[in-house]
Amino acid sequence: VQTCALPIYHEGEQVGLPSLEEYNAQVRNGIPLSKDFYLRRFPVAYQFRGFHAVVMGKAKAAFILARLFNDKALRDIATRQVEYILGYNPFAMSTVYGDGYDYPPLYGAYAGNVVGAVPVGIETFENEDEPYFPIQNNCTYKEIWTHTTARLMWCVAELFK
C-alpha cells in the first residue's frame, strides 16, 4: 500500500474516526469533580465542530421553560446564551457577521459573507476543553449554517415576548 502526504486542512483531520480513547481523553480534559466524574465546558465532539446550534437549542428550551414557570433567573440564563453568540464570550467578539465592530469573516462557499449570518460556532481544539476560534476562515467552525442563524433569530424573538 502506497500512501501520500496530504496537507492538513484543520486541526481534527488527523484524529480519524471516533474511538473510546478519544472520547475518554475529551472527558478527562474537563474539570475533575471526583475520581470518576468530570465537568466539561464544551460538549464532547469527535469532529470538533462549533457548538452554536447546541447553545441556541438549549437557550430556546430555557426561554420556553422560563415563560411557562415565570422564572426570571431561567430567562436570564437563556439571555446569556444569546449574549455569548453576540460577543459576551472569551474572544469578546460577536460571531454574527455584521454585528458589532470586530466580527470575523465567515465561510460561505457560494454566498460569501451574509450580513446577519451565524457560523457553526466556537469550538475546542482537538481533545481540549478550552474555547478555540482562530482567525483563519475555515468551514469547520466559521461555515454559515442556516439552522444556527434561524435558532438565534428564534431566541431573539423570545426576548420580545
Please annotate each region the language model reported.
Residues 1, 7-161:
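Aromatic (Trp/Tyr) and acidic
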